[in-house]
Design a protein with these regions (language model features):
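Catalytic core of tubulin tyrosine ligase-like
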Residues: 240-245, 253-257, 262-439
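Conserved beta-loop-beta/alpha segment of the NTase-like Rossmann-fold superfamily
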Residues: 184-284
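N-terminal glycine-rich phosphate-binding loop and ensuing alpha1 helix
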Residues: 3-188, 196, 207-225, 229-233, ...
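Hydrophobic/aromatic beta-strand patches that form the interior of the parallel beta-sheet core
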Residues: 108, 127, 159, 188-190, ...
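Short, flexible, glycine/charge-rich loop motifs used to bind or transfer phosphoryl groups or to couple energy/partner
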Residues: 96-98, 234-235, 263, 318
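Residues immediately flanking
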Residues: 111-112, 249, 332
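Generic detection of intrinsically disordered/low-complexity segments and helix-coil linkers/edges
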Residues: 17-18, 250, 396
Length: 469
């Protein structure tokens, strides 16, 4: 036994994980090295603690106190209603446009998820979502960034977080499409970390083969550590980037680098700004932003009883109205502060079915939804909210900005998202004076127009032809 092994063996014994070495003697040297490397990177004690905590039912008193203390979020910029509101939004837009012109904005797309609900066999960004063409999610975002760059004569770096599950294919896809003409040197792919799944009953780390732990991406909260370890926080600082526009891979109608959102964020010197939309019903399965003891936090829909979800404040408005669209703007220095102590973002436990190799070396694929065999661990980026000293919430226009692709069918599916893209296109065309029947699909590339005003102007000048849409 070499000294590395004896050290590893001690740690494994102490944390009841010796089964990881069960097949060590049967492995090739490189497999042995790889297994020891995976074990070396794993915080065995922390995993043990988390598993132990997961076997208690948590602290229902703390959870109940959190919900009782929750108030409607305080600092919210609402959608404009009055002329004064419109003036405020106009001013914020001008401030945001200036930040863009000055080159202070970068986009971060988190694209490391496994997209299991959609059931698409490739990274979700490669999903064809165009109502008339096979335009993918990646292409829509790339074209939005290119169009913003052209409009403001500026550089907007694009940072894409991938994972073991999505990296190689994403890289090949972007190469094959020549980075959609953004220039390879301004698109940064970086990989998030991964964490092993644990057997829910025993806390033992699951293995996917004789030499591999059953790993999965460490959640969108893995962004903070991943940015830092890829050296990107330094790079952003060198490029004088101040604002990181964060969004998820699944919403093709997000307004990337939305000048109004950027403007409010910059005006208020917010460290973390979040776009929210009004929930359609209290029962809607959406996390909501609230104020808890003076801090902004997210309450997950699963934390609320139906009665709590429908609770109203003194103005008769739902307390839990402000649905999280996962569109955020981070102040770069705030991200640096988070990265300096990454343990500030807690690990969350989710019970899921995870395939694994049993003690005889055979693969088992549990599939009982009522009794998941494993716990998976993830960090959530929105846990940064209560850490921030200065947060801001801006209400977005739901039908325009939030039409995600989550499920294979039904709500939040390719059908609803494609229909939204067509509807938005029809609205822009109507504003330009062209009526299109409701059942006719419309697809407007961000390179043709980023909004209704631009489309009107370009149709008038002939730069865009009706026949092309
Ligand atoms: P979701 O919570 O929708 O998860 O991710 P998912 O993995 O994409 O899909 P399901 O739940 O398996 O169906 C929201 C966003 O966070 C990213 C996803 O790529 C998506 O943009 N994400 C999620 C990561 O980048 N890494 C992760 O580890 C998890």
């Amino acid at each position: 036994m070499n000294p590395i092994n004896s050290d590893v063996r001690d740690r494994l014994t102490e944390t009841s994980q010796t089964h990881l070495l069960r097949f060590l003697s049967e492995l090739s040297t490189s497999e042995q090295e790889s297994l020891l490397h995976q074990i070396g990177k794993t915080d065995l004690r922390l995993l043990r603690q988390i598993w132990k905590a997961s076997t208690n039912d948590g602290s229902p008193i703390d959870a109940a106190a959190r919900i009782t203390a929750a108030r409607s979020p305080g600092k919210v910029v609402r959608q404009p209603v009055s002329a004064a509101d419109s003036e405020r939004w106009k001013q914020a837009t001008q401030v945001g446009e200036n930040e863009l012109r000055e080159g202070r904005v970068a986009v971060i797309t988190v694209a490391g998820g496994q997209g299991s609900r959609l059931g698409f066999d490739h990274p979700k960004g490669m999903f064809p979502i165009g109502p008339k063409t096979d335009r993918t999610l990646f292409q829509i975002f790339a074209e939005q960034i290119l169009a913003r760059r052209q409009r403001y004569h500026t550089a907007i770096p694009w940072l894409i977080m991938t994972s073991d599950a999505t990296h190689a294919e994403t890289h090949t896809f972007l190469e094959e499409h020549n980075y959609f003409n953004l220039g390879q040197d301004s698109v940064y792919l970086f990989q998030q970390g991964s964490l092993p799944a644990l057997d829910a009953a025993s806390g033992r780390i699951l293995m996917s083969s004789r030499s591999e732990l059953a790993l999965s991406p460490d959640g969108h909260g893995g962004l903070v550590a991943a940015l830092a370890s890829a050296g990107l926080l330094n790079l952003l600082s060198q490029h004088n980037i101040r604002h990181l526009f964060y969004h998820q891979i699944d919403n093709p109608t997000v307004i990337l680098c939305d000048p109004a959102l950027l403007g409010f964020h910059a005006q208020q010197r917010s460290q973390l700004t979040t776009n929210v939309v009004r929930k359609e019903s209290p029962a809607e399965r959406m996390g909501v932003l609230v104020d808890i003891n003076g801090r902004t936090e997210i309450v997950e829909y699963s934390e609320l009883t139906p009665e709590q979800a429908a609770c109203c404040d003194e103005n008769g408005e739902w307390i839990f109205w402000a649905g999280n669209t996962a569109i955020h703007i981070f102040d770069r220095e705030f991200l640096e502060q988070l990265a300096a102590d990454e343990s500030q973002l807690p690990l969350h436990v989710a019970r899921k079915n995870v395939g694994f190799m049993d003690d005889r070396g055979e693969i088992v694929r549990p599939d009982d939804p009522a009794n998941p065999n494993a716990i998976k661990l993830e960090k959530f980026i929105f846990d940064a909210l209560p850490i921030a000293e200065r947060t801001l919430i801006v209400e977005g226009n739901r039908s325009r900005e939030f039409n995600p692709v989550k499920n294979r069918s039904g709500a939040d599916s390719p059908d609803t998202s494609r229909a939204a893209l067509s509807r938005i296109g029809r609205e822009w065309l109507a504003a330009a004076g062209y009526e299109v029947p409701a059942d006719q699909p419309v697809e407007i590339s961000p390179l043709q127009a980023l909004d209704a005003e631009e489309l009107t102007a370009r149709l008038k000048s002939g730069a865009v032809r009706l026949a092309d849409l």
